[in-house]
Amino acid sequence: MDGFFKVHYVDGKYFFEIADSLFGRDILIVNRVVKAPVDAQKRKVGYPGDYISDEVIRFEKGRGDKLFVREISYLEHSADTLGMYQAVLNSNVQPIVATFPLKTVRKEGETTNYVIDMTDYIRKDNEMFSFTSRVKDNIGASSMVDDASYIDTLKAFPQNIEIRTVRTFQRKKGGGSGLEKLLAAFFATSTTPLTYELNSSMLL
């Protein structure tokens, strides 16, 4: 699949082929709900299209045979006209939030492409492609059930990559208060897991 980077699906695994021309460029990830369980917490997050979170990342070549992903914060910034832009860049270190071993490196003319396996990272519970800890608290979810969570579809387009996942969570005991507890007891027992369909958009 050709998008702003190539996506390969081989033997049940998703491989991203990142060109070095994308290194250092901002990629926005926006997470939204597609479907949600019938649950009292739905009024907080749960209707189709409900916003979950967003973050900006950058890919970069790490040391050795690794590719790094940094989470980018713009809490501190400065306009070029103030002559402070480079000083701000030099005084802030953006965190490395993920590292991936290189599966292969491929040359295309002047471009070098780096291939990484993203399957487990996307499928497992992490804030880049799933709920933040704050949202999980709000919806009464705790740990993710691995064998009931999976990547549904992954599609590549020229300006975006669309990832749809199904994620099942254990229900947090004692979540919510007052009316929320009463409604939760009406809709489901405290041991009923919560299954969500989520969509993650990676935008260049």
For each feature predicted by the language model, list its residue ranges.
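Auxiliary tRNA-acceptor-end handling modules of aminoacyl-tRNA synthetases
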Residues: 1-204
